[in-house]
Amino acid sequence: MASLLFFCGAFYLLGTGSMDADVTQTPRNRITKTGKRIMLECSQTKGHDRMYWYRQDPGLGLQLIYYSFDVKDINKGEISDGYSVSRQAQAKFSLSLESAIPNQTALYFCATSDL
């Protein structure tokens, strides 16, 4: 029997800079089989330079996966293993789970900042 994983995206705006930034994550919710590749898209409309991907496991705080301070500027966070990102445009920052495993079941948050 194949294991199913549940990934839930949420909207999150980092508490620095402008508080009216529009940040969108797609898909909003995702269920997949173990071993499948998953892509989460983050887009923003305020032209912020900095974008971040976080993960929150049940009962724990946010953990930084990757961050970017500008287009094609990619930096690893504290838990980047098993993930990859792409930032080909200022307004978009994509997160990929290369091969979904049960311990990656979590809430995933995208954030932006202009500072």
Swiss-Prot record:
Residues 22-115 form the Ig-like domain. Keywords: Adaptive immunity, Cell membrane, Disulfide bond, Glycoprotein, Immunity, Immunoglobulin domain, Membrane, Receptor, Signal, T cell receptor. Glycans are attached at residue 103. The keyword Cell wall biogenesis/degradation does not apply. PROSITE patterns: IG_LIKE (PS50835). It is found in: Cell membrane. GO terms for biological process: adaptive immune response; cell surface receptor signaling pathway. Disulfide bonds join 42-110. One of its GO terms (cellular component) is plasma membrane. Residues 1-21 form the signal peptide. The keyword Kinase does not apply. V region of the variable domain of T cell receptor (TR) beta chain that participates in the antigen recognition. Alpha-beta T cell receptors are antigen specific receptors which are essential to the immune response and are present on the cell surface of T lymphocytes. Recognize peptide-major histocompatibility (MH) (pMH) complexes that are displayed by antigen presenting cells (APC), a prerequisite for efficient T cell adaptive immunity against pathogens. Alpha-beta TR is a heterodimer composed of an alpha and beta chain; disulfide-linked. The alpha-beta TR is associated with the transmembrane signaling CD3 coreceptor proteins to form the TR-CD3 (TcR or TCR). The assembly of alpha-beta TR heterodimers with CD3 occurs in the endoplasmic reticulum where a single alpha-beta TR heterodimer associates with one CD3D-CD3E heterodimer, one CD3G-CD3E heterodimer and one CD247 homodimer forming a stable octameric structure. CD3D-CD3E and CD3G-CD3E heterodimers preferentially associate with TR alpha and TR beta chains, respectively. This is T cell receptor beta variable 24-1.
